Design a protein with these regions (language model features):
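Conserved core of the PLP fold type I
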Residues: 64-188
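N-terminal small-domain helix-loop-helix segment of the aminotransferase-like
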Residues: 2-6, 10-100, 107
């Protein structure tokens, strides 16, 4: 199936967080200029037809009450984990549902740490991670990313190791591609 990645959508005036308001700064572009929303992981291409079809089918039911996740939801995750990561024995009861990345991060942080625990996060960092740690009462310990001689962002493994040991850290957040620098981490 081919997808449309070339149509430019004008999302201004449609409650688009990426285009209608630039948070954190209070600054709006001067008249005649546009902002490029590099601060948010929001895609501006047309949604894939199967996604639109599924949403439209769901909207045919005029009630949006609570729903149960279908078997296909769990099967797709189990198959993806098996094929992509070699995970065997994953069961539906091992899979949770989250509405977004930050909800998932919050659930994981609250499941494996306690308020006051220190969490390792690379900086620069996505402000959503910062707010989630603050909201859950965790303490951020930053490990600064370093640029190599080619200008590529790299993790500083010595710094990470030292901070993990010195701060008795048992939980770290890795973001790939890294937000905000866009670096996709290699598998070693």
């Amino acid at each position: 199936m081919k997808y449309d990645f070339t149509t430019v959508l004008d999302r201004r005036g449609r409650d688009s967080l990426a285009f209608d308001k630039i948070p954190f700064t209070g600054v709006q572009p001067d008249e005649g200029f546009d902002a490029i929303p590099m601060w948010i992981a929001d895609m501006s291409f047309v949604a894939a037809p199967p996604a639109m079809e599924a949403i439209l089918k769901r909207m045919e039911m005029p009630n949006f009450g609570y729903f149960a996740l279908p078997d296909e939801y769990f099967d797709s995750i189990i198959n993806w984990q098996r094929k992509r990561n070699g995970v065997e024995g994953l069961l539906p009861e091992n899979i949770g549902y989250e509405n977004g990345v930050l909800g998932g991060v919050s659930s994981a942080v609250q499941s494996f740490t306690s308020p006051g625990d220190k969490i390792l996060i690379h900086s620069p960092t996505y402000v959503g991670f910062t707010h989630t740690m603050d909201d859950t009462g965790r303490v951020i310990v930053h490990s600064e990313l370093q640029r190599d001689e080619q200008g590529i962002w790299r993790m500083d493994y010595e710094d990470m190791d030292r901070k993990l040991k010195e701060n008795n850290i048992h939980f770290a957040i890795f973001c790939s591609p890294h937000n905000p620098c866009g670096r996709v981490w290699e598998r070693w």
